[in-house]
């Protein structure tokens, strides 16, 4: 199916995310969609609760995004289509790494990942016909040891910003990754296997 055909097809679901990577991944499997730009509440990047496991944290944040999107959808009286939300976080030494606040924060995160293995958790939540379905992808990623000069150049590229763990595996940082066990698309931000399975379980055909 060509991009032109996809563009002509009516949207089949809402994507409650501004991430261009998630949009590209949905189009990759032929799922036309509308990006739902839900107004973000104060403190959107909610911290992990005390004692909350990383997997539970990322599930909760994806679920919250989906439920908030569904409420906004109804408040705007928009057509009722399935709504998909996702959240990604990086975990090293049991510590959740979200999106870096600034260059110093990005350098700190990248230094923590250098030469080590970490986990990337991406949770997906689907609201459809009054029911919420969810799943989570957990992928182990190993980065080679990185020189300080490499980290500085990477930050100069602007790529670390807006990404959990301060890197994007589909970009320049792909050259940093020596091994991956799990879902490549999950590390990008939307695990396609789990996403397609959720959609099928809700009776939504996936090409």
Swiss-Prot record:
What is the protein name stated in its UniProt record? dTTP/UTP pyrophosphatase
The protein's required cofactors: a divalent metal cation
Gene Ontology terms, MF aspect: dTTP diphosphatase activity; UTP diphosphatase activity
State the family it belongs to.
Answer: Belongs to the Maf family. YhdE subfamily.
Per the entry, what this protein does is: Nucleoside triphosphate pyrophosphatase that hydrolyzes dTTP and UTP. May have a dual role in cell division arrest and in preventing the incorporation of modified nucleotides into cellular nucleic acids.
Question: What are the record keywords, sorted?
Answer: Cytoplasm, Hydrolase, Nucleotide metabolism
> Which EC numbers does the record give?
3.6.1.9
Q: What is one cellular component GO term in this UniProt entry?
A: cytoplasm
Entry annotated with the keyword Zinc-finger: no
Nucleotide-binding in keyword set = no
Q: Which reaction does it catalyse?
A: dTTP + H2O = dTMP + diphosphate + H(+); UTP + H2O = UMP + diphosphate + H(+)
Q: Mind giving the lineage of the organism this protein is from?
A: Bacteria, Pseudomonadati, Pseudomonadota, Betaproteobacteria, Burkholderiales
Short name of one Pfam family for this protein?
Maf
Q: Which residues form the active site?
A: 87 (proton acceptor)
Give its localization: Cytoplasm
InterPro entries, per this entry? ITPase-like_fam, Maf-like
Q: Which cysteine pairs are covalently linked by disulfides here? A: none
